[in-house]
Regions:
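Broad gene-expression machinery/nucleic-acid interaction feature
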Residues: 3, 44-46, 118-120
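Residue-level recognition of alpha-helix initiation/capping sites
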Residues: 70-71, 89
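Alpha-helical scaffold within the catalytic cores of cyclic-nucleotide enzymes
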Residues: 10-47, 51, 71-84, 94
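Active-site-proximal flexible loops/turns
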Residues: 5, 9, 16, 57-59, ...
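Short acidic/histidine-centered micro-motifs embedded in hydrophobic/aromatic stretches
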Residues: 2-3, 24, 97
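Short acidic-rich active-site patches of cyclic nucleotide enzymes
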Residues: 1-6, 10-11, 52-53
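Cytosolic regulatory/linker segments at or just downstream of nucleotide-handling modules
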Residues: 54-56, 63, 76, 82-131
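Short, surface-exposed loop/helix-turn segments at secondary-structure junctions
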Residues: 59-70
Length: 131
């Protein structure tokens, strides 16, 4: 498919999970920009992030797969699907977990199916002095 999920803090909770997820998201977008410059392509990507508890486990009887379920997974998916190309859209819950001074811009409140209004932000960068 054209959608990939990355997680941090499994199988054990990691209270410092948001910073590496934010840094990875920024790095992926930067690498995509460099790829486009070097190859004359115009590939675009949306990234969404949310923080919270998930249910995780292995399913299957002949072909096993490790999978995740729950409201947190659904919200992260909504952040990606309602995002803007070449932007990282995050929830307030994710923003509140950041310990480094990442720059964020308030996008506004989005109506999220099955949840209601959710405050969202665009993750812009991490100032050099804080990296």
């Amino acid at each position: 498919g054209d959608c990939y999920m990355a997680v941090c803090g499994l199988p054990y909770a990691n209270p410092a999970h948001a910073d590496p997820v934010a840094a990875l998201s920024l790095r992926i977008l930067k690498e995509l920009q460099l790829f486009n410059q070097h190859n004359g392509t115009h590939l675009k990507m949306r990234v969404g992030a949310h923080s919270g508890a998930v249910v995780a486990g292995v399913i299957g009887s002949s072909k096993f797969i490790y999978d995740l379920w729950g409201d947190t997974v659904n919200m992260a998916s909504r952040m990606e699907s309602t995002g803007i190309p070449d932007q990282i859209q995050v929830t307030e819950a994710f923003r509140d977990q950041l310990s480094k001074p990442f720059n964020l811009d308030f996008r506004g409140e989005l109506e999220v199916k099955g949840i209601g209004k959710v405050s969202t932000y665009f993750l812009c960068d991490l100032p050099e002095e804080a990296a």
